[in-house]
Regions:
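Conserved beta-strand positions in the central sheet of alpha/beta enzyme cores
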Residues: 44-46, 78, 99, 139
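Catalytic cores of alpha/beta
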Residues: 83-94
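Alpha-helix-loop-beta-strand connector modules within alpha/beta enzyme cores
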Residues: 55-79, 118-140
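Active-site mouth loops of central-metabolism enzymes
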Residues: 10-30, 75-84, 109-117
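Glycine-rich, proline-tolerant flexible connector loops at the mouths of alpha/beta enzymes
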Residues: 43-68, 102-116
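N-terminal small/glycine-rich loop or linker at the start of catalytic domains
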Residues: 1-22, 58, 99-112, 135-140
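N-terminal glycine-rich anion-binding loops that anchor highly charged ligand groups
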Residues: 3-11, 30-48, 54-60
Length: 140
């Protein structure tokens, strides 16, 4: 087996690390976190997600976070999007990259994104097409 010549590490703390916190973390603190990660050399940062605030209230301020961060050349600021509505938010927020998420099992898919694997793939298709038409890379 040949190992890859390089590895891409994506810092997920501002999104995955905070999304399940019971107490809402204010946008200025999230902005400070992203800025500190940037200043400490992280090149790929998942800064938020454009999901339903009903399901993930912690991410309701992702547009404010994306608007408030001090972007640095060479750093990719991505956001997670589950559907076209999320993509529109990511586009307006000038995300450098979007992330989509899927599941390997039907049970996890239903629990995590409230649909079957087949339905999730159908949702991702227009998101990926829209991202490509706007020159936005997709990770997932």
């Amino acid at each position: 087996m040949k190992l890859p010549s390089k590895v891409k590490i994506v810092e997920m703390g501002p999104r995955d690390g905070l999304q399940n916190e019971a107490e809402i973390v204010p946008a200025p603190i999230k902005i400070t976190l992203v800025d500190k990660l940037t200043n400490n050399g992280f090149r790929f940062i998942e800064a938020g997600s454009f999901v339903s605030p009903k399901w993930i209230p912690q991410m309701a301020d992702s547009s404010d976070v994306m608007a408030g961060i001090r972007r640095k050349a060479g750093v990719v600021y991505s956001v997670l999007v589950p559907n076209m509505k999320g993509f529109e938010g990511a586009l307006a927020a000038k995300a450098s990259e979007i992330a989509i998420f899927g599941a390997a099992s039907e049970a996890f898919s239903k629990k995590n994104i409230n649909c079957s694997i087949e339905d999730s793939l159908a949702r991702f298709e227009p998101v990926c097409e829209a991202a490509m038409s706007h020159g936005i890379p997709v990770r997932g």
